[in-house]
């Protein structure tokens, strides 16, 4: 898994690539990267899943932990470009009832305002 951060106005966009699974853990997890942005004062986080091929229960936990951390500070965390396969996983885990998920980045960005 590789994660690159970019900014658009006051929104932090994390472009995630590869597989989000426990066996691919690097030194820094997605949740840690989100927490770093929150600690620096950012409150609008967008996770771009366009290049994500697979997610396991660890990855689902990372997303949920990121959502909770953001929500607890009054921020918003949203997801964009989820594949049908990943969307099914989010449906089964009931995350579609908690998370805002968008098909297009521009729509997701506008939803923050």
Where do the model's predicted regions map?
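Short beta-strand/loop segment at the start of cytosolic alpha/beta domains
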Residues: 1-15
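A short acidic, often aromatic-flanked loop/helix-cap motif at beta-alpha or helix-coil junctions
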Residues: 12, 107-110
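Short hydrophobic/aromatic patches at helix-to-coil boundaries
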Residues: 2-4, 109-113
């Amino acid at each position: 898994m590789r994660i690159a951060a970019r900014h658009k106005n006051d929104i932090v966009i994390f472009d995630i690539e590869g597989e989000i699974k426990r066996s691919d853990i690097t030194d820094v997890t997605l949740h840690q990267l989100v927490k770093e942005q929150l600690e620096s004062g950012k409150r609008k986080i967008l996770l771009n899943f366009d290049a994500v091929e697979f997610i396991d229960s660890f990855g689902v936990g990372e997303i949920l932990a990121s959502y909770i951390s953001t929500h607890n500070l009054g921020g918003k965390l949203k997801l964009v470009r989820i594949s049908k396969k990943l969307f099914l996983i989010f449906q089964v885990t009931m995350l579609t009832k908690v998370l805002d998920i968008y098909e297009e980045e521009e729509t997701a960005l506008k939803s923050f305002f």
